[in-house]
Every structure is written in C-alpha cells, then in structure tokens.
C-alpha cells in the first residue's frame, strides 16, 4: 500500500491513518499469481450503519476451543468491585473477538437480562461481553475508570481480543463513565456507545487521532431535559472529527436497536 510492504494486518491501519480524507494512493496485490495495482482514495469514516451485515465464519484453520466459555468471574484482588464476562460457547482461540464493556445505570445491574440480550450476538458476531459493577451499586464514581481499564486488561490476558472492536457501552450514569473511559483511554477504546447520557462538560476531549480512532454512537430522547446539552456536546465531537452516529430512544434501546448497535460494532474494524 502506497509502496510500503504489509507485514501484519495492523500495518494497514497505520499506513492508511497517515492519509488525510481525499488522499489518493496505490495498492498492489497478487491475484491468481499475477500482480495487480489499482488506485484508491481515502474518505472520512462513515456514520451510517448497514441494514445488513453478513456473518463471517471463522477460518477452518482457527484453533479449537481451549479456553473456558460461559460466565467467567473477573476478580481483581486489589479492587472491591465485582465483574463477570460472557464468553460465547462458539469461542475459538484462533478467532479475535470484539469486546463490549457494559456499564450499568446507577443501582441497576441485572446479569440475567444482560445475558439474554447479548448471548446470541456474542455467539454470532464473535463478541465477549464484560460486565463490571460499581463498588457501590447506587452509583459509579470517576475513579472507577481505572478499575474498568484493569478489568479490560485482565480479560485480554486470557482471551484473544480484536483491538479494533473494543467498545464501552453505558446507559445513563454508565454512559457518562463510558465517555470518561473512552476519552481517557485513547490507546485502547475504539468505540463508545451511550444511551441517555451526556458528555461530561469538564471532560478533556482531544481531536480525533487517525491512529487512535474513536467512533461514537449516542441514543437519546429528544424530549429529555438533557437533550439540548447532549446535542451541543455531540456537535462539538463532530467538529473535532469524531464520526458520530445518533439515534432516538425512550429508555434503553429496543431489540431492533440493539441489533443495529451490534452491526455498528462490527463495522469498527473497517479500513
């Protein structure tokens, strides 16, 4: 690509991230034993969500399942918080899995409901659902950003995580913490999806960086008293070149909207 050799897939993101939208470059491939070169141009990351996205089956050569699946406790000895991960039965160590970190609303953590909502998506789309809890169920505190980061690092030690599909997803107070985590952990988080949550006004939000790109999905109720402030904050993110996708929702997402959110997550690894 652009006369640079590709050794590993991550090289592609690094090379393409060095171009501004609208830049032209060449790509050379070997097709049926013959070299081919074509010209392409870059564009800004789209904010539309595909209505359909084909399931990609794992390669037949993917390693067999040697890891523990199901509901896995994730306990950090130095932290009082509880955490559990849902690892799909379809997990294979040779297949990178996206990671969805669910951050619950204040005082509302229902593990059974979460498993019911996400299990089929985890199996079909190669996702692991990480469910950390606030130390005090009634509310998250800003310092728990560090705890959630540790929990993410812990699950990455045991399972093969697709670094391009690490998403923090929160509702209400959990969504506020999701924004804090996403913008403070730019080296790690590639997507933030919130429902009925505002970007904290004092949060330091840097311009989007091509080599540490971050996509935003925000669902809200247009009749909410917070709607105007939330819209202004999202405009600021767009001005800073973040791809922002917005949806309307009263309360949490409907089942169809969760399906769409999963497709949004699945597009985060696009070039």
PLM feature spans:
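Primarily recognizes the serine-hydrolase "nucleophile elbow" in alpha/beta-hydrolase
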Residues: 164-212
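Cell-envelope and extracellular/periplasmic
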Residues: 104-108, 136, 156-159, 171, ...
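Short substrate-entry loop that stabilizes the transition state in hydrolases
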Residues: 91-141
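The feature captures the conserved acid-bearing segment of alpha/beta-hydrolase catalytic domains
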Residues: 191-269
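Gly/Ser-rich "nucleophile elbow"/oxyanion-hole loop immediately N-terminal to the catalytic nucleophile
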Residues: 89-96, 140-173
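PDZ-domain C-terminal substructure recognizer with occasional recognition of PDZ-binding tails
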Residues: 10-52
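A domain-start/cap signature at the N-terminus of enzymes
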Residues: 43-97, 173, 180, 231-236, ...
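Alpha/beta-hydrolase fold active-site loops
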Residues: 98, 127, 165, 213-215
């Amino acid at each position: 690509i652009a006369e640079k050799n590709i050794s590993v897939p991550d090289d592609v993101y690094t090379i393409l991230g060095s171009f501004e939208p609208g830049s032209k470059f060449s790509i050379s491939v070997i097709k049926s034993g013959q070299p081919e070169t074509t010209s392409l141009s870059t564009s800004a990351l789209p904010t539309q969500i595909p209505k359909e996205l084909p399931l990609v089956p794992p390669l037949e050569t993917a390693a067999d399942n040697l890891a523990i699946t199901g509901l896995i406790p994730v306990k950090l000895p130095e932290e009082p918080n509880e955490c559990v991960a849902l690892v799909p039965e379809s997990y294979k160590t040779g297949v990178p899995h996206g990671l969805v970190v669910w951050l619950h609303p204040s005082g509302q953590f229902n593990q059974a409901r979460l498993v019911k909502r996400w299990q089929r998506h985890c199996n079909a789309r190669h996702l692991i659902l990480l469910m950390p809890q606030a130390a005090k169920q009634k509310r998250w505190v800003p310092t728990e950003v560090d705890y959630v980061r540790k929990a993410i690092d812990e699950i990455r030690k045991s399972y093969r995580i697709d670094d391009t599909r690490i998403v923090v997803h929160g509702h209400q107070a959990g969504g506020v913490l999701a924004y804090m985590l996403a913008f403070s952990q730019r080296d790690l988080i590639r997507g933030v999806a919130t429902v009925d949550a505002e970007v904290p006004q004092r949060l330091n939000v840097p311009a989007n960086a091509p080599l540490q790109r971050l996509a935003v999905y925000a669902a809200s109720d247009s009749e909410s008293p917070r709607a105007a402030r939330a819209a202004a904050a999202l405009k600021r993110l767009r001005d800073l070149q973040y791809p922002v996708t917005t949806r309307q929702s009263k309360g949490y997402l409907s089942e169809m909207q969760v399906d769409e959110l999963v497709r949004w997550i699945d597009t985060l690894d696009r070039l």
